C-alpha cells in the first residue's frame, strides 16, 4: 500500500468548515437486516467488557499524557457517523495541544511532528482508541466498521472519490477492514474500496477475525502513523 501524500495525492489542508455538505446526498440507502441486530448485541457485550478491562490502562496513559505535554489528557472531535450523522469521538490526546492551528484539518502522516512521543507509542499500540469503547456502548460506533472521518475531510474525499460517502451506510468502527489490510498509510480511495468491501460482506464472524487482526497489530505496532 502506498503512503498518502497530503500535499499532492490528497489535498486536504486548510479546508474551511461548512454546514451544508454535499456528501450527505451521496450516501445511498442504509444497510439493514438481522445481521445488524446480532452485530449490536455483540458490540455491546464486548464493548462493556472492553470498557472495564481497559479502564486501568486508559487511566495510566491519561496520567502520562498530562505529565509529558501541555493540554488535556482526553479530547473530543466531531466525526461523521451512520448516514452522515455527526457525533463526538473520544480519544486519548496523542498530538501536541493546538497541533492543527497552522495545518488545518489534515490526515496524520508517518513521523508526523505534531505527534508527541507518548502519542506515537499510543498510536502504534492503538491505546489512544480505547476510550472509544464508550462510543460503542452509546451506539455511535461499532467495534468493527469503517473508521469515521471528520466532516471537512469526508466532504473533500467525497468530491474526489464518488464512492467514499457509501462508507456511511453502516455504523463506523474502532477498527476496520481497511486498517487491518492497509494500515493507516493508505489513500482515501484505497480505504474507500476496502471499507465498502467490508460493508458488503460483514458478519459477526468477519468482525471477530478483524478484532483478532487488531490484537496482532497492537502487539506488533504495525500499521500506525
Regions found by a protein language model. Name each.
Residues 1-5, 144:
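A membrane-cytosol interface segment of integral membrane proteins
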Residues 5-48, 76-77, 183-204:
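Glycine-rich flexible loop motifs, especially short His-Gly-Gly/GGXG/HXGH segments used as catalytic or interaction
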Residues 6-15, 75-114, 175-193:
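Short, glycine-rich, amphipathic interfacial segments at transmembrane boundaries or analogous
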Residues 28-98, 135, 209-225:
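A hydrophobic, helix-centered structural microdomain
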Residues 29-30, 166-225:
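C-terminal terminal-structure detector
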Residues 31, 35, 112, 123-127, ...:
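Short, solvent-exposed loop/helix junctions and linker helices
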Residues 63, 76, 91, 114-117, ...:
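Residue-level recognition of specific faces of alpha-helices
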Residues 108-171, 210-218:
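A short, structured surface patch at a secondary-structure boundary
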Amino acid at each position: 500500500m502506498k503512503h498518502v501524500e497530503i500535499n499532492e495525492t490528497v489535498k486536504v489542508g486548510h479546508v474551511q468548515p461548512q454546514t451544508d455538505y454535499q456528501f450527505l446526498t451521496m450516501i445511498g440507502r442504509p444497510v439493514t437486516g438481522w445481521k445488524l441486530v446480532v452485530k449490536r448485541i455483540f458490540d455491546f457485550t464486548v464493548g462493556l467488557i472492553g470498557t472495564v478491562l481497559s479502564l486501568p490502562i486508559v487511566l495510566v496513559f491519561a496520567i502520562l499524557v498530562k505529565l509529558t505535554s501541555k493540554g488535556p489528557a482526553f479530547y473530543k472531535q466531531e466525526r461523521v457517523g451512520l448516514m452522515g450523522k455527526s457525533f463526538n469521538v473520544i480519544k486519548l490526546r496523542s498530538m501536541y495541544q493546538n497541533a492543527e492551528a497552522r495545518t488545518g484539518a489534515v490526515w496524520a502522516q508517518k513521523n508526523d511532528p505534531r505527534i508527541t512521543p507518548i502519542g506515537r507509542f499510543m498510536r502504534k499500540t492503538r491505546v489512544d482508541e480505547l476510550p472509544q469503547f464508550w462510543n460503542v456502548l452509546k451506539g455511535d460506533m461499532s467495534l468493527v466498521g469503517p473508521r469515521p472521518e471528520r466532516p471537512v475531510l469526508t466532504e473533500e474525499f467525497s468530491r474526489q472519490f464518488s464512492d467514499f460517502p457509501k462508507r456511511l451506510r453502516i455504523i463506523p468502527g474502532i477498527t476496520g477492514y481497511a486498517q487491518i489490510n492497509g494500515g493507516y498509510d493508505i489513500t482515501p480511495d484505497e480505504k474507500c474500496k476496502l471499507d465498502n468491501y467490508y460493508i458488503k460482506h460483514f458478519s459477526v464472524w468477519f468482525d471477530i477475525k478483524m478484532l483478532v487482526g487488531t490484537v496482532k497489530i497492537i502487539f506488533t505496532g504495525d500499521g500506525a502513523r
